[in-house]
């Protein structure tokens, strides 16, 4: 038996029932899609720089992540389709930004958490 497992089986029915009831009202699959999109380090880099700069054109993003504009566009389009980013067109340029403050906070908190974990270990 390992230290990180219960040695006996005991179900806390009140907590389990409450959690199941609340979980049934949520949409974990859609939330999982957000985390799946952000599980790619290139897309995390893009989300991070958008949280810093507010808005960047596709060419700038491509330069920052050291890729072609086609590759940057692919990642940005995926982020847009999942509600993480939005875009606007100005003349011949397309500018992307994070969809809203919640997304920005999610990205910032993830980086903060990573720094805290790194400082402990």
Swiss-Prot record:
GO terms for biological process: response to cadmium ion. PROSITE patterns: HTH_ARSR_1, HTH_ARSR_2. It comes from the Bacteria. InterPro entries: ArsR-like_HTH, ArsR_HTH, HTH_ArsR_DNA-bd_dom, Metal_resp_trans_reg, WH-like_DNA-bd_sf, WH_DNA-bd_sf. The keyword Transcription regulation applies. Residues 23-118 form the HTH arsR-type domain. GO terms for molecular function: DNA binding; DNA-binding transcription factor activity. Keywords: Cadmium resistance, DNA-binding, Transcription, Transcription regulation, Transposable element. Pfam families: HTH_5. Residues 58-77 bind DNA. This is Cadmium resistance transcriptional regulatory protein CadC homolog. It comes from Staphylococcus aureus. The gene is cadC.
């Amino acid at each position: 038996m390992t230290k990180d497992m219960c040695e006996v089986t005991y179900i806390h029915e009140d907590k389990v029932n409450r959690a199941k009831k609340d979980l049934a009202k949520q949409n974990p699959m859609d939330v999982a899609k957000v985390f799946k999109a952000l599980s790619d380090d290139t897309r995390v880099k893009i989300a991070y720089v958008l949280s810093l700069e507010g808005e960047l054109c596709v060419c700038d993003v491509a330069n920052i992540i050291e890729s072609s504009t086609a590759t940057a566009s692919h990642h940005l389009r995926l982020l847009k389709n999942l509600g993480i980013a939005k875009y606007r067109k100005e003349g011949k340029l397309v500018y992307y930004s994070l969809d809203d403050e919640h997304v920005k906070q999610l990205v910032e908190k993830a980086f903060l958490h990573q720094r805290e974990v790194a400082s402990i270990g």
